[in-house]
Amino acid sequence: MAKEYSRTQRIGDQMQRELAQLIRREVKDPRVGLVTITAVEVSRDVGHAKIFITVMGQDSAEEIAQSIKVLNAAAGFLRMQLAREMKLRSVPQLHFHYDESVVRGAHLSALIERAVAEDSQHPSTPEDAKE
C-alpha cells in the first residue's frame, strides 16, 4: 500500500509555511509585491524545490518577471534561512516560478459568467422545453 502523504509532500508543506513568513519578514526589495506561495514541489531526492507564487497587484508580465528574478536572486539567502528553521539534513535549492493557474481560473470563471449571462438574455423556445 502506497503512502498517502509522502515525505516530499510534508517537506513541501513545511517549506511553504516557512517561506511565506521569511519572504514577508526578510525580503525588503520594493520590486517584490505581496507574494503568495501557492504550491511547493520537492524533488524525490530533496535536492530541488519548485516554488509556485502569485504576486498581488502586479498584472503586467514585466512586473511579475521582475519579482521572480528578485526572488530567484534571493534564493540562496532564503535557503540559508530555511536551514535554520527546518530540521533537514540538506535544504533543497529553491527555484521560483509564477503560478498561472490562478489567472487561468479567473479567466475561465469570467467566461462561464459571460455565457450564463448570455443564456439568461435569450428566452427559451418551446422546442427547448420538449428536450
From Swiss-Prot:
SUPFAM superfamilies reported in the protein's UniProt record: Ribosome-binding factor A, RbfA (SSF89919)
Cell compartments where the protein resides: Cytoplasm
Coiled-coil blocks: none
Highest taxon of the lineage: Bacteria
Its job: One of several proteins that assist in the late maturation steps of the functional core of the 30S ribosomal subunit. Associates with free 30S ribosomal subunits (but not with 30S subunits that are part of 70S ribosomes or polysomes). Required for efficient processing of 16S rRNA. May interact with the 5'-terminal helix region of 16S rRNA.
Entries under PANTHER family matching the protein: RIBOSOME-BINDING FACTOR A, CHLOROPLASTIC-RELATED
Family listed: Belongs to the RbfA family.
Protein name as catalogued: Ribosome-binding factor A
Organism: Pseudomonas fluorescens (strain SBW25)
